[in-house]
Amino acid sequence: MMTLQLSGYAPSRVDARRAAELRPLVEHFNIEYCAVLDSGHIEEWPRFFTEDCIYRITARENAELDMPVGLVYAEGRPMLHDRAVAISRTQMFAPRTMTHLLSAPRIVGEDGQEIWAQCNYVLFQTLVEGPTTLHLAGTYHDRFVRDGDELLLRERQVIHE
């Protein structure tokens, strides 16, 4: 099993033809994933993950120092569900909309069971009575598994600048 490389560059271990076959699957996944989040359907977010998933948001500086302490850490779909419910039902935040923009995914590895991919993202936030601002930017480092014809995230490491 390949581990996710969270900093620096490593060449893809997938040839161009195979990467071209896998890229549309990962793109479709990411488009649907962001559509759920951007539409405010936060409680549907955990369905994109396996039961034994890992989800973490970490600053690039921490990732480069191999100190994956981050803003968010969730292990398992139930933990993601708790987080999603807390976010969707809290009243402590001003009303806002979020908009994700993603690069094309880079397929970095595959072993028959998993697909490893990276994708740059920018997250914009618009408060009801304010301008749109850049909220976060960085890279998704993903481990996908197949669930029939669909993909699920076994691991998503969100490294932000």
Regions found by a protein language model. Give the residues of each.
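A beta-strand edge to alpha-helix "cap/lid" segment located at domain peripheries
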Residues: 2-11, 98-101, 106-161
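Short, low-complexity N-terminal intrinsically disordered segments enriched in polar/charged residues
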Residues: 2-39, 43, 47-51
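Short coil/turn segments at secondary-structure junctions
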Residues: 13-17, 64-67, 71, 128
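A generic "alpha-helical surface" signal
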Residues: 24-27, 71, 78, 135
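Hydrophobic pocket/interface hotspot
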Residues: 33, 45, 80, 117, ...
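Short helix-to-loop capping/linker segments positioned immediately adjacent to catalytic or ligand/cofactor-binding
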Residues: 33-35, 88-95, 128-131
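Surface-exposed helix-capping loop/turn segments at secondary-structure junctions
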Residues: 36-44, 93-96, 149-150
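A solvent-exposed, acidic/Ser-Thr-rich amphipathic alpha-helical stretch
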Residues: 51-120
